[in-house]
């Protein structure tokens, strides 16, 4: 369903409308931070994002054009991640500290940390009493204190 018309997406909407043309846009965690520029939807339709600054695209967000003729659903892409766990909560906290000290993005869950797969990080983690497992999962890192979002 490729259209020749230039599709400019400008707004977030709260609910998925029943009528209109719907497109899906699958993005990784880095791409979900960029609110402006050209993108290719899952069906290879080029769109232009011109969203207001100061936000972030989230899994399930619905975007629309000014004329509300087109809607784009944001889908979080599955990424290669490292799942970090430990029997010691203190060791997990120390690991989180060292990852943060290196400005590594981390998703924090109840008993695990998740970060993007990287051999340098994996080598660093060998110095801690943690278990690491390579997994495929959607990644939702914490927003940092110095975030510009």
Curated annotation (Swiss-Prot):
Pfam families: UreE_C, UreE_N. It is found in: Cytoplasm. The gene is ureE. This is Urease accessory protein UreE. GO terms for molecular function: nickel cation binding; unfolded protein binding. It comes from Prochlorococcus marinus (strain MIT 9215). GO terms for cellular component: cytoplasm. Belongs to the UreE family. Involved in urease metallocenter assembly. Binds nickel. Probably functions as a nickel donor during metallocenter assembly. It comes from the Bacteria. NCBIfam families: PRK13261.2-2 (NF009756). GO terms for biological process: protein folding; protein-containing complex assembly; urea metabolic process. Its main location: cytoplasm. Keywords: Chaperone, Cytoplasm, Nickel, Nickel insertion. SMART domains: UreE_N.
